[in-house]
Amino acid sequence: MTARASTLSLMDVLLPRATLVQNILLIFSGSLLVALCAQISFYLPFSPVPVTGQTFALLLVGATFGARRAAAALLLYLAQGAIGLPVFAPGGLPGLARFAGPTAGYLLAYPLAAFLLGWLTERLSRRAWLLAVLAAEAVIFAGGVSWLKVWAQLTWPQAAAQGLLPFLPGDLLKVVLVGACLPASWWALEKRRPTRER
């Protein structure tokens, strides 16, 4: 494998000359994956923010699609929710009203987190995937906790207690799952590629 290939996203290597149609399909599939994973959700009794599978899907899309496709997929996901499609986690406000609710900060941070994760994976060694994923998680929690503090008129410790600390164990599991998927995906891709392209 060439040195340049190590700085490309998984999809860039899989589709080195992706057409416009292929890129559109990838972006749509990324938004669909996030929407499907969002349906896996439950609420904790002491927080207005649900535990969902959204962030797992975001991390997977960000780590494999590259910065621009990942950000576009998450922007499309937010647009789908804004017009009323049932893509957000169940139980919250519908449509645009969701962006005035307790989870708005997390949602609005999604495209930035996806872009950052994609940007880092395009530039860092694959062994540095943990750093890239943690940076994306930090962006999500920064947006989410900051908005929750304002929305619920909480102190910073209260906002962290409701919007950060309860979710750390679950998000650690998501990081581990993404970390398990990435090496396996790269290994499978490299097994398929001719030796002369490596």
Language-model segments: what does each one mean?
Residues L14-A18, Q22, F46, A89, ...:
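Juxtamembrane/transmembrane-helix boundary motifs in multi-pass membrane proteins
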Residues S41-L116:
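Alpha-helical membrane segments and adjacent membrane-interface helices in multi-pass membrane proteins
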